[in-house]
Design a protein with these regions (language model features):
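PAPS-dependent sulfotransferase catalytic core
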Residues: 1-75, 221-226, 232-235
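PAPS-dependent sulfotransferases, especially Golgi type II membrane carbohydrate sulfotransferases
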Residues: 1-5, 147, 153-158, 172-177, ...
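Residue-level preference for the first positions of well-ordered beta-strands
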Residues: 4-6, 79-82, 183
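Hydrophobic residues in well-ordered beta-strands that form the structural core
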Residues: 30-32, 82, 109
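C-terminal/domain-terminus segments
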Residues: 41-42, 191, 266-271
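CE4/NodB-like, metal-dependent polysaccharide N-deacetylase domain
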Residues: 65-77, 167-178
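Glycine-rich phosphate-binding loop used to anchor ATP phosphates in small-molecule kinases
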Residues: 69-94
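PAPS-dependent sulfotransferase catalytic domain
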Residues: 86-213, 229-235
């Protein structure tokens, strides 16, 4: 029987390379962004269907939902599955896990300075292959043309209904004492400076046997596409070596944008 863990966290925070390293261990499979959460929430609606109200099969429906993770990962031989979706730490996700998957809830959360995340997005979008992309179309349509494009992108990315703000909101459940033990944060800068230490901390958190990982010539075996639905290429492409290649936010964003999105790294107060 497979054991399930969960990865949430922020975009552009090293989740892809972190997963690539963990996947060197044949007993571990860390997925790219996965549809498992949506699949399970969709099936929960079956409880409210008219057919189930007339002929109650709620217990059978629950059994089907419980089996979805095992069927979904039936092609993986790994003992330990780390399913990635930013929604897992929200109340619906946590309840799904507790009721249908495991009582041993553990969230791995790659995180990064918010301004560095914004700057990293800007860097990737400005690459030659990504000049024309869906996200910029939305940025131009939904932000005011009173500031440079980089700052308009920042405002768009930080909207309450976009992934950065959502992931921050969901992870803030870790600030509640009764939920703190469910979360393990992997800060991008800590990971870059000492990846072996951070990987070992993950094993300690998951309470599974350690593995002798390699930190050079890293290969992503997940099969995730280089293309993105946003039109931004190489969002998930990793380098073979672990290094920080990034511009400074001060070189990209206006001072008022930097001020607006500074100091949001609440997890640093939890250590």
């Amino acid at each position: 029987m497979k054991e399930f863990f969960f990865m949430a966290g922020m975009q552009r925070s090293g989740a892809t390379i972190l997963s690539a390293i963990l996947n060197q261990n044949p007993d571990v499979w860390a997925s790219p962004a996965s549809p498992l959460f949506r699949m399970m929430t969709t099936q929960i609606q079956s409880h409210n269907e008219l057919e189930n109200i007339d002929y109650n099969r709620s217990e059978a429906i629950d059994n089907v939902i419980k089996n979805i993770p095992h069927i979904f990962y039936a092609d993986k031989k790994a003992k330990y599955i780390i399913d990635k979706n930013l929604n897992w730490p929200n109340p619906v996700g946590a309840e799904l896990i507790f009721k249908y998957i495991t009582r041993n809830i553990k969230f791995i959360c790659p995180v990064r300075n918010v301004l560095d995340v914004i700057t990293s997005f800007d860097t990737v979008i400005n690459s030659t292959d990504s000049k024309n992309n869906i996200m910029d179309e939305q940025v131009l349509k939904n932000t005011f043309a009173d500031k440079p494009l980089a700052d308009r992108r920042a405002d768009f990315l930080m909207r309450h209904d976009k992934d950065i703000a959502l992931s921050l909101e969901f992870m803030k459940h870790s600030t509640l004492p009764q939920f703190r033990h469910l979360f393990h944060f992997v800060d991008y800068d800590d990971f870059i400076s000492d990846p072996e230490r951070e990987i070992n901390k993950i094993y300690d958190f998951l309470e599974i046997p350690k593995f002798n990982h390699k930190y050079e010539n890293i290969v992503d075996t997940s099969g995730i596409s280089r293309e993105s639905l946003t039109g931004i290429k190489d969002l998930h492409t990793i380098r073979p070596t672990i290094q920080k290649v990034s511009r400074r936010p001060e070189d990209v964003l206006l001072p008022e944008t930097i001020k607006r999105y500074s100091g949001l790294e609440f997890w640093r107060e939890l250590r």
